[in-house]
């Protein structure tokens, strides 16, 4: 039968790209060795080219490989070792005689190409199974070798675990000179090629100096033979199928019984034991409804076995080493999945904290039971919470794990309410964390919004909200770890207490900046047009639910106050003397301290900001400047009063009254007397410590409310008196109540801040008049000396007395008390004798 009567070869579905190899510069063409025609076919002469050179070309060959040489590797047992696979003879070699030296090769790394399905071979003589051009060749010993079993794949590269190499063109060596499709002539491959187990050269082996990239030098590698459609003997771990997703793998061709053998890659000659073992991937957890209460998950049907053969499309052909969490260990891990997975999934759908807070306020308006918690509709049913329509938090009784465990039928109504209260701590924290993440991702990390602000304004506006988010994430993770242990929550107050005494201090730092946040936000909205426009765009996003930015900035303080209310509700439901009650009391006390510190810091920052603004208005003229801004100082009261004075006239004119407007600033430890000036400036006239200021009402029923303000020691250490008029009686009462009135000395010590010019002495022992120049000193008396002589005598109000009889008073409290005693003594003496400033006898 001639070649003209044979049908044309059917091209493959995906023709692999061909690699055009350059022709060697100097190499003689091998003479055409006429071999026996294969299957009765003969070469066919093609039309001559323009240069009238003969261009012989091979015709399609139909050949059936021997049955003994096509034993599929997939038929080997799974436990077959690599040594047993390597000991087998290559399919295309007639003997197993080892080759002394392999052909040297160079490394090359071509790009891998997709594999195309290979059709199964047909019986001999069938005109429907054309193979690639192939002919019988002679072995090195001169004997004709058996028909080859290596398919010629031009440009076919396979990628694998060890970098599968290439399969180069193998032209027919029986022809002397042939041209490929691109006109390039190929040299016949007559050299020897190395096989894995030292088998004789294959029929289509390359010459020793073959320039093709597949036979270049690759140190440490040797040529391997693998089945078509398979992979090398690399341990493969099947991937676990998830019932929640569909397989996205490529469809594989059906498995064939007798696959052809094709050269696909190189394999390293290193020992197998030096390669790191591949660990199987951790199985992905499956939803509870798909693994516990539903059908078992089905494994992927496109997994490959260890020998690279498709496992099949039936679930019965799943690999035997499937992880037990998917097939065999479903009952053992059922409880673990029930504990962990079901408690995390509902928290992903929690509403924003603003929505949760509005729902809580609505619940209080909808009505509650007598014990402070919503009452169930029926006595035997689980307690149901009346909720308004819309997003709401998950209830403990709605969890699938709780419903499946039967706790709703065994727990008492009081314990069920306790579980709901404990679980609300978790769900509310999840809502709070979701809002914080939305604030951070949408506003804080927005580059468009950052470009409209200065770095200082950006830091002032958002402060340390990212640190607050980190604390909330760790707190929620600790709560979830406690909740996952059992559907029945034992206690959470100890977790709250542990975080309240430690990480929750970050709330104090954040709330301290609240005053600056409000001022910065108002200023930016009024003056920064770009900021307001970008902020409106971000607030209009669907994920923000049209909530304004200030509602996010107030979240930390709202959360810490809501947490205290939740702890109070838990404490009311705990049993007397139980561990829950003790933990709830500790947690409530720690959270209350955090709130008190937050409130104090808010007020302190407001006062500090007010002191800063007030300092910018003060002008100290002819008065020693005083540092006004202090963390311990706060402004308690300020008001405008009128000072009554006398303006002295000349000889012809008598004195006439003078009215001077004053502005008094009363701080927690200081009194400033100022006079208003233009431009809202205040000129400081005098100041004194608050403990050295006294106010007394002047009886004058016909005139406006008037009182006398006395400074026992002003900024110069001298006493001063002023007569002031108030605009109303209530204003005068406020000023009178702000200062201590003359009377018995208080038992509690006062805080002393200022010093007096003259020193004070305390008598340590009684003395006779002879020692004190006519005046006697009693023990514990407080004489006031004005001059100290070199002889050691002190001269003062009581007279001259020796210095060894007294000791100096250094305590500020005692000094202030003595000044007040002296002032009362002067007033008492002046009222009785008619001379207010008369010295004591």
UniProtKB/Swiss-Prot annotation:
It holds the Pfam family RhoGEF. The modification Phosphotyrosine is found at residue 353. One of its GO terms (cellular component) is glutamatergic synapse. Residues 111-124 have a biased composition (Pro residues). The keyword Cell inner membrane does not apply. PANTHER family: GUANINE NUCLEOTIDE EXCHANGE FACTOR (PTHR12845), RHO GUANINE NUCLEOTIDE EXCHANGE FACTOR 15 (PTHR12845:SF7). It is found in: Cell projection, Dendrite. Residues 65-110 have a biased composition (Low complexity). Specific GEF for RhoA activation. Does not activate RAC1 or CDC42. Regulates vascular smooth muscle contractility. Negatively regulates excitatory synapse development by suppressing the synapse-promoting activity of EPHB2. The keyword Phosphoprotein applies. GO terms for molecular function: GTPase activator activity; guanyl-nucleotide exchange factor activity. It comes from Homo sapiens (Human). The modification Phosphoserine is found at residues 107, 109. Residues 1-179, 239-261, 279-333, 765-793 are annotated as: Disordered. Residues 417-601 form the DH domain. It comes from the Eukaryota. Expressed in the vascular smooth muscle of coronary artery. The gene is ARHGEF15. This is Rho guanine nucleotide exchange factor 15. Interacts with EPHB2. Interacts with EPHA4. One of its GO terms (biological process) is negative regulation of synapse maturation.
């Amino acid at each position: 039968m001639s070649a003209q009567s044979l049908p044309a070869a059917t091209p493959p579905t995906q023709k692999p790209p061909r690699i055009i190899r350059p022709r060697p510069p100097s190499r003689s063409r091998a003479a055409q060795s006429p071999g026996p025609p294969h299957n009765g076919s003969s070469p066919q002469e093609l039309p001559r080219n323009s240069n009238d050179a003969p261009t012989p070309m091979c015709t399609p060959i139909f050949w059936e490989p021997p049955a003994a040489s096509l034993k599929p590797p997939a038929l080997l047992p799974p436990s077959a070792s690599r040594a047993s696979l390597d000991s087998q003879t290559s399919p295309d070699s007639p003997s197993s005689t080892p080759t002394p030296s392999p052909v040297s090769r160079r490394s090359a790394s071509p790009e891998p190409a997709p594999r195309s399905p290979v059709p199964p071979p047909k019986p001999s003589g069938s005109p429907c199974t054309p193979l690639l051009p192939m002919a019988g060749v002679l072995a090195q010993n001169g004997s004709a070798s058996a028909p080859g079993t290596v398919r010629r794949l031009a440009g076919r590269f396979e990628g694998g675990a060890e970098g599968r190499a290439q399969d180069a063109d193998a032209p027919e060596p029986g022809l002397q000179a042939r041209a490929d499709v691109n006109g390039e002539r190929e040299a016949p491959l007559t050299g020897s090629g190395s096989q894995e187990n030292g088998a004789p050269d294959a029929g289509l082996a390359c010459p020793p100096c073959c320039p093709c990239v597949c036979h270049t030098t690759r140190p440490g590698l040797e040529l391997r033979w693998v089945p078509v459609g398979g992979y090398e003997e690399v341990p493969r771990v099947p991937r676990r199928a998830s019932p929640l997703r569909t397989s996205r793998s490529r469809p594989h061709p059906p498995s064939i019984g007798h696959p052809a053998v094709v050269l696909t890659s190189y394999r390293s000659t290193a020992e197998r034991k030096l390669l790191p073992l591949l660990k199987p991937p951790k199985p992905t957890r499956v939803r509870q409804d798909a693994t516990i209460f539903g059908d078992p998950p089905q494994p992927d049907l496109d997994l490959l076995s260890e020998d690279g053969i498709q496992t099949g499309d039936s679930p019965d052909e799943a690999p035997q080493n499937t992880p037990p969490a998917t097939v065999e260990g479903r009952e053992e891990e059922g409880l673990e999945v029930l504990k962990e997975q079901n408690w995390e999934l509902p928290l992903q759908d929690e509403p924003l904290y603003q929505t949760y807070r509005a729902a809580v306020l609505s619940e209080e308006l909808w009505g509650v039971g007598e014990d402070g918690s919503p009452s169930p509709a029926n006595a035997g049913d689980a307690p149901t919470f009346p909720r308004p329509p819309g997003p709401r938090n998950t209830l403990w009784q709605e969890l699938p794990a709780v419903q499946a465990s039967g706790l709703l039928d065994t727990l008492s109504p009081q314990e069920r309410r306790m579980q709901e209260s404990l679980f609300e701590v978790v769900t509310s924290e999840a809502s709070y964390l979701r809002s914080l993440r939305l604030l951070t991702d949408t506003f804080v990390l927005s580059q468009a919004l950052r470009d409209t602000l200065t770095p200082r304004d950006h830091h002032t506006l958002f402060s340390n909200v990212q640190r607050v988010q980190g604390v909330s994430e760790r707190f929620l993770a600790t709560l979830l770890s406690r909740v996952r242990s059992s559907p029945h929550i034992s206690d959470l107050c100890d977790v709250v207490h542990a975080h309240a005494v430690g990480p929750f201090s970050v709330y104090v730092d954040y709330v301290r900046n609240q005053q600056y946040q409000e001022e910065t936000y108002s200023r930016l909205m009024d003056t920064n047009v770009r900021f307001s426009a970008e902020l409106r765009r971000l607030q209009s996003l669907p994920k923000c639910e049209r909530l304004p930015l200030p509602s996010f900035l107030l979240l930390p303080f709202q959360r810490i106050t809501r947490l205290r209310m939740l702890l109070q509700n838990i404490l009311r439901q705990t049993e007397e003397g139980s561990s829950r009650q003790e933990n709830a009391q500790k947690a409530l006390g720690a959270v209350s301290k955090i709130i008190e510190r937050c409130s104090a810091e808010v007020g302190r920052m407001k006062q500090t900001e007010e002191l800063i603004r007030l300092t910018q208005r003060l002008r100290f003229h002819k008065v020693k400047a005083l540092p006004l801004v202090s963390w311990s100082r706060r402004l308690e009261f300020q008001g405008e009063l009128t000072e009554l004075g006398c303006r002295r006239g000349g000889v012809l004119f008598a004195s006439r009254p003078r009215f001077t407007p004053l502005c008094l600033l009363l701080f927690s430890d200081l009194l400033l007397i100022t006079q208003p000036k233009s431009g809202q400036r205040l000129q400081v006239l005098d100041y004194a410590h608050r403990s050295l200021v006294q106010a007394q009402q002047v009886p004058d029923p016909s005139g406006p409310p008037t009182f006398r303000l006395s400074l026992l020691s002003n900024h110069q250490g001298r006493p001063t008196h002023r007569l002031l008029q108030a605009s109303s009686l209530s204003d005068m009462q406020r000023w009178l109540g702000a200062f201590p009135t003359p009377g018995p000395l208080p038992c509690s010590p006062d805080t002393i801040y200022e010093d007096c010019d003259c020193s004070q002495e305390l008598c340590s022992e009684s003395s006779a008049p002879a020692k004190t120049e006519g005046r006697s000193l009693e023990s514990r008396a407080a004489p006031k000396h004005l001059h100290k002589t070199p002889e050691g005598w002190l001269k003062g109000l009581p007279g001259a007395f020796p210095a060894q009889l007294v000791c100096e008073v250094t305590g500020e409290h005692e000094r202030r008390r003595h000044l007040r005693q002296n002032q009362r003594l002067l007033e008492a003496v002046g009222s009785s004798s008619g001379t207010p400033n008369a010295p004591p006898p």
